[in-house]
A protein has these predicted regions:
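Short amphipathic alpha-helical segment within the helicase RecA-like ATPase core
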Residues: 1-284, 288-291
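A generic structural signal for tightly packed, nonpolar segments enriched in small/aliphatic residues
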Residues: 59-60, 126, 222-523
Length: 523
């Protein structure tokens, strides 16, 4: 098996023209005719090669584009990579916003991802990033550093773990540095880079676990990964309930979904213990992630086309794992509980059936009308567990409904909840992290559709508003806790490679949830 590309990222103070590297990366806006000072200085040493490239129309600087200019011994860098930044965003003063203005941060993140992906394709061993210079110092350098680090990990990622054919010159390691000629600026960049490295590594970790197929990662395998994570970080502890222990507690939702598979379900709990004696006074945040390690639909079986992608139905649970990894590394001053109900949804003689009535961990009964609406069946037990642990804030994340993908496409996750402040905090975190969300309703009108005539609830509503009725079902299990639901169906996977990253799992949710927790800790 191949190892995932190992990225080493640091900051360095160095004059740009004296930076010895395979690839020096700078940014250019599409609607700014005059080159920034750094680019002008480089271009003067390159005999105007950059300006000629732009004037000839060979590089239009649109977002997601790039062009290579060779150093030819005129500068220390072997190559200069021009990365398109698209149209220039207004300055913070013009926008009336703080210096960490969010739009440009995602521009920088995407540009770094584009550059890292290009570096991997070109098999460049060393890369130096100076993307922040195009913004002229208008934005917070720490935030810029974090965005560049996150983008570097996102763009350099590729999943070829089980490809046995050798690839000539395949990169095993990519050395990246964020550079500036001013040591004070480098120090500010470094504060953000150090955080971005932690978050970027956590997202890559989540992408790899999610990409692994169901014969490699089943519920027990996911539990083993959680235990390994807890061994790696002293502030994490892990508890795993097997099917007998779940039965003793009455976790009927998870048990029903997993009943058809020989790979029995697991209920995984990761607890983060913060490094502060006053932690008992702080609220506890629960992250609840759906982990269906393979979803055939059960007896209500899915079409064969694209069923292989159903290994990705564990994305929500693994996003929680990745977030817990980042939280432990960052040592945030918060109480955080990661709850991951894990099961495999397969048809067999022992599967749960349409028409069955299931008693969940909360005591509420659910009429099963479709076994392919299984995510909510396991999440309701996870949410009830969080309530019984007296968690003040509960956020669940799941590839819950195809309806959400129909509504929002592959660009945004659906965001629902019962607390306006929490919703706004998650929207802010989405803007900060570049993982976009869109608010959707889940109120009483939708809850009415989930009532059953022969049980407390049924597990599907009508064909209309499926993302909203799915969230309304989950809402019945959160009690008085502040709750938010992220439906990430649609944003969980890249069907094909983009200008910014490889195809496969996106790792969506790790940056968003970690950013939310970082913002909460700072507030």
């Amino acid at each position: 098996m191949k190892n995932i590309i190992d990225v080493e990222l640091r900051t360095r103070t160095v004059d740009f023209s004296q930076c010895k590297t395979d690839l020096l990366v700078i940014g250019q806006f599409s609607d700014v005719e005059r080159l920034d000072r750094l680019t002008r200085e480089l271009d003067s040493k390159l005999d105007g090669a950059i300006e000629r490239l732009i004037k000839l129309g060979d590089f239009k600087a649109k977002e997601g584009t790039n062009a290579v200019v060779y150093g030819n011994g005129r500068i220390e860098a072997e190559r200069v990579l021009l990365v398109g930044l698209g149209e220039k965003k207004k300055s913070p003063a013009e926008l009336g916003e703080p210096r960490f203005t969010r739009g440009p941060l995602d521009t920088v993140r995407k540009a770094a991802a584009n550059a890292a992906k290009k570096a991997v394709e070109m098999k460049m061993g060393s890369v130096s990033l100076a993307l922040h210079k195009a913004f002229g110092g208008q934005f917070d350098l720490s935030a810029m550093g974090r965005a560049m680090a996150e983008g570097t990990y996102f763009g350099s990622y590729r999943y070829d773990e089980f490809v046995t054919d050798s690839e000539d010159g395949r990169l095993d390691r990519l050395k990246v540095e964020v550079i500036d000629s001013d040591s004070a600026k480098t120090e500010k960049l470094n504060r953000g880079v150090s955080r971005g490295v932690i978050i970027g590594k956590a997202q890559s970790y989540a992408r790899t676990l999610t990409n692994r197929p169901a014969n490699v990662i089943n519920p027990a395998g996911l539990a083993a990964a959680a235990k390994e994570l807890a061994r790696d970080y002293e502030r994490l502890s892990c508890t795993v309930l097997d099917e007998k222990q779940m039965a003793a507690k009455g976790m009927g939702g998870v048990l029903a979904v997993g009943s058809g598979s020989q790979n029995k379900p697991r209920f995984i709990v990761l607890k983060y213990n913060p490094p502060n004696k006053t932690a008992s006074k702080w609220p506890t945040v629960a992250l609840v992630g759906k982990a269906i390690t393979f979803d055939s639909g059960g007896i209500s079986i899915k079409p064969a086309e694209k069923m292989e992608e159903m290994k990705l139905d564990k994305t929500g649970g693994i996003a929680v794992l990745g977030t817990m990894k980042a939280v432990a590394e960052l040592q945030l001053p918060l109480n955080v509980l990661g709850i991951i109900p894990a099961a495999e949804n397969l048809p067999s003689g022992s599967s749960y059936r349409p028409g069955d009535i299931i008693t969940t961990f909360s005591g509420k009964t659910v009429e099963v009308q479709n076994t392919d609406a299984e995510g909510r069946m396991i999440l309701c037990d996870g949410l009830s567990y969080a309530v019984k642990q007296n968690c003040n804030i509960i956020i669940d994340i799941a590839t819950l409904t195809g309806a959400c993908r129909v509504a929002l496409g592959k660009y945004m996750a659906g965001l629902m909840g019962n607390d306006d402040k929490l919703i706004k905090q998650l929207q802010t975190a989405a803007e900060d992290s570049g993982e976009k969300v869109w608010p959707m309703p889940s109120g009483d009108e939708y809850a009415q559709e989930m009532k059953s005539k022969i049980a407390d609830l049924k597990n599907i509503g009508s064909k209309w508003g499926g993302a909203c009725t799915g969230a309304a079902f989950l809402r019945q299990f959160v009690g008085d806790a502040k709750w938010a639901h992220l439906d990430i169906a649609g944003v969980d996977v890249f069907d094909k490679a983009t200008e910014f990253t490889a195809e496969g799992s996106s790792g969506f949710g790790v940056r968003l949830l970690t950013t939310y927790l970082m913002n909460l800790a700072e507030s």
